[in-house]
C-alpha cells in the first residue's frame, strides 16, 4: 500500500528538547511529502496556535494536524474537530492534587495558560515556558477548556505514580505521561489515537496507509491505531516496545530522513 498520511509527534521526535524550531531538513522533508501527494503533519500535545512557530512559521507544515493530544484536529488549516475538558472533572483532579506536594494544574482558554493550582516556582521547574507566561487565577471556567495539564515536580517514576493516582481517582478524564514532570489531561477515552482514527475515517485512508512517529507515553494510542508505528531512538520504554518499527535519534534528523524516503516511494523501515 502507498503511504497516504504521515503524522509525527513534535517534542523529542522531530524537535530535540531545548530547541525552539525543527531543522530546515525537517521542513523540507514535509514539503517533499506534500509534493508527493502525501498528507503530513504533527500529532502533538501542544496547542495548535503554537505549532507553526516550531516550523519557522511555515503553517503549511501543520495544515494537517492533531493538536492538544487529540482534542483538536485540523484539515487544510481549518479546525475540523474540537473536544473540551469537563470542568467538574477538573475540580475533582484539583481535589486529588491538593493532597500531593509539588504538583499543580494548568488550564487554557484560548492561548493563555492559567495556573489554577500549585506554585509558579514548581511550574518553572517542570515547564519553564508556561511558568514564565501563565496567569494565576482561582476559579475554573464552567466551559471552554480546550487544554489542561498537570505538572509534577520530580523524576519520571514520581510522574508515573501521580498520573496513575489521577487515573484511579478521577472519573471522566484520562492522564498520560509524555515526559517527566508533565501530564496531558484529556476527556476519558479521547487521545491522539482516537483523533487519528477519526481523521482516517474522514479522509478514507486505511490503517495500513498511514505512518506515525513518536517517542512517549502519549503516543501509545496513536501507535496502536495504525499498522506502521515508528519510535525514535531514546523513546520511553513503553513507546519503544509498542512501536512496530525503530529508527535513529531526533538529534540526527531520523524522522525527516524517513519522510524523505517515503516521499520518494521507498520504504525506510526494517526489523
Q: Where are these predicted regions, by residue range?
A:
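Mg2+-dependent phosphoryl-transfer enzymes with acidic/Ser/Thr/Gly-rich catalytic loops
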Residues: 2-5, 23, 185-271
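Asp-based phosphoryl-transfer active-site loop
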Residues: 4-19
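Active-site metal-binding loops of divalent metal-dependent hydrolases
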Residues: 10, 46, 70, 214-216
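Active-site phosphate-binding/coordination module
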Residues: 21-122
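Short, structured coil segments at secondary-structure junctions
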Residues: 60-61, 69, 169-171, 225-226, ...
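Short hydrophobic/aromatic-enriched beta-strand-loop microsegments
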Residues: 62-68, 82-83, 127-128, 229-233, ...
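Conserved acidic, metal-coordinating active-site core of Asp-based
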Residues: 100-104, 108-225
Amino acid at each position: 500500500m502507498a503511504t497516504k498520511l504521515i503524522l509525527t509527534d513534535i517534542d523529542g521526535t522531530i524537535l530535540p528538547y531545548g530547541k525552539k524550531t525543527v531543522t530546515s531538513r525537517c521542513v523540507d522533508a514535509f514539503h517533499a511529502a506534500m509534493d508527493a501527494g502525501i498528507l503530513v503533519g504533527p500529532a502533538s500535545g501542544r496547542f495548535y496556535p503554537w505549532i507553526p512557530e516550531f516550523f519557522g512559521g511555515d503553517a503549511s507544515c501543520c495544515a494537517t494536524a492533531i493538536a492538544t493530544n487529540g482534542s483538536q484536529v485540523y484539515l487544510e488549516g481549518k479546525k475540523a474537530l474540537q473536544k473540551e475538558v469537563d470542568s467538574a472533572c477538573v475540580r475533582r483532579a484539583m481535589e486529588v492534587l491538593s493532597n500531593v506536594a509539588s504538583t499543580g494544574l494548568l488550564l487554557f482558554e484560548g492561548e493563555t495558560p492559567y495556573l489554577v493550582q500549585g506554585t509558579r516556582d514548581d511550574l518553572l521547574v517542570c515547564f519553564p515556558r508556561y511558568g514564565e507566561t501563565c496567569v494565576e487565577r482561582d476559579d475554573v471556567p464552567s466551559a471552554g477548556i480546550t487544554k489542561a495539564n498537570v505538572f509534577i515536580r520530580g523524576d519520571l517514576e514520581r510522574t508515573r505514580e501521580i498520573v496513575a493516582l489521577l487515573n484511579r481517582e478521577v472519573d471522566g478524564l484520562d492522564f498520560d505521561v509524555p515526559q517527566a514532570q508533565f501530564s496531558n489531561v484529556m476527556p476519558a477515552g479521547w487521545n491522539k489515537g482516537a483523533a487519528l482514527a477519526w481523521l482516517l475515517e474522514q479522509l478514507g485512508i486505511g490503517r495500513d496507509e498511514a505512518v506515525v512517529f513518536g517517542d512517549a507515553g502519549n503516543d501509545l494510542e496513536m501507535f496502536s491505531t495504525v499498522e506502521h508505528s515508528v519510535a525514535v531512538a531514546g523513546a520511553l520504554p513503553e513507546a519503544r516496545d509498542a512501536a512496530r518499527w525503530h529508527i535513529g535519534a531526533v538529534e540526527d534528523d531520523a524522522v525527516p530522513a524517513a519522510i524523505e524516503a517515503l516521499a520518494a516511494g521507498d520504504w525506510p523501515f526494517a526489523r
